[in-house]
From Swiss-Prot:
A biological process term (GO) from this entry: terpenoid biosynthetic process
Binding, a divalent metal cation: D15, H17, H49
Listed name of the protein: 2-C-methyl-D-erythritol 2,4-cyclodiphosphate synthase
Subunit structure: Homotrimer.
EC number: 4.6.1.12
Keywords on record: Isoprene biosynthesis, Lyase, Metal-binding
Function text: Involved in the biosynthesis of isopentenyl diphosphate (IPP) and dimethylallyl diphosphate (DMAPP), two major building blocks of isoprenoid compounds. Catalyzes the conversion of 4-diphosphocytidyl-2-C-methyl-D-erythritol 2-phosphate (CDP-ME2P) to 2-C-methyl-D-erythritol 2,4-cyclodiphosphate (ME-CPP) with a corresponding release of cytidine 5-monophosphate (CMP).
Catalytic activity: 4-CDP-2-C-methyl-D-erythritol 2-phosphate = 2-C-methyl-D-erythritol 2,4-cyclic diphosphate + CMP
Cofactor: a divalent metal cation
Top-rank EC class of the record's enzyme: lyase
Residues at the site labelled Transition state stabilizer: H41, T137
Species the sequence originates in: Corynebacterium diphtheriae (strain ATCC 700971 / NCTC 13129 / Biotype gravis)
Residues annotated to bind 4-CDP-2-C-methyl-D-erythritol 2-phosphate: D15, A16, H17, H41, S42, D63, L64, G65, T136, T137, T138, D139, F143, R146
Length: 160
């Protein structure tokens, strides 16, 4: 009998959205009252979107665009919570286990620090695996530094 080693698979992804005045601000599956959200076909949650993309990349199951597409009515305004849930279900249906995820928000606002642990808890519960969240500014450089948009970078580990 041969023991086949479990080989972790790593995915990486980014997401970016333009800030839209007056739109609710969803970041890491949390609503940030008083901050403008991001435009998009969905809720504009760059953190959740980047993590979904990283998970799909790790499992070689496409990307966010192929997963939900743009222009599909059933996904108009879809939440990051729903996308993460459906992504977890897809990975499980293909025999994958999620090891962990890590996401960094890039932008001037909202301040993630006060709600970082809450974001980690919520996303970890959705995925059934540890998720770490961090944030950084770009010292006012680029579109995120000028508060024109937000971005996120994510990695994920899965195995079969």
């Amino acid at each position: 009998m041969t023991n086949t080693p479990i080989i972790p698979r790593v995915g990486i992804a980014t997401d970016a959205h333009q800030i839209e005045a007056g739109k609710p601000c969803w970041i890491a599956c949390l609503l940030f009252s008083g901050a403008d959200g991001c435009e998009g076909h969905s809720d504009g949650d760059v953190v959740a979107h980047a993590l979904v993309d990283a998970l799909l990349s790790a499992a070689n199951l496409g990307d966010l665009g192929s997963f939900v597409g743009v222009g599909r009515k059933e996904y108009d305004g879809v939440s990051g919570t729903q996308l993460l849930t459906e992504c977890r279900e897809l990975l499980e249906s293909h025999g994958f286990t999620i090891g962990n995820g890590a996401v960094q928000l890039v932008g001037q606002s909202p301040k993630m620090g006060p709600r970082r642990e809450e974001a980690e808890r919520v996303m970890s519960e959705i995925l059934g695996a540890p998720v770490s969240v961090s944030a950084t500014t770009t010292d006012h450089l680029g579109f995120t530094g000028r508060s024109e948009g937000r971005a996120a970078v994510a990695t994920a580990v899965v195995w079969k």
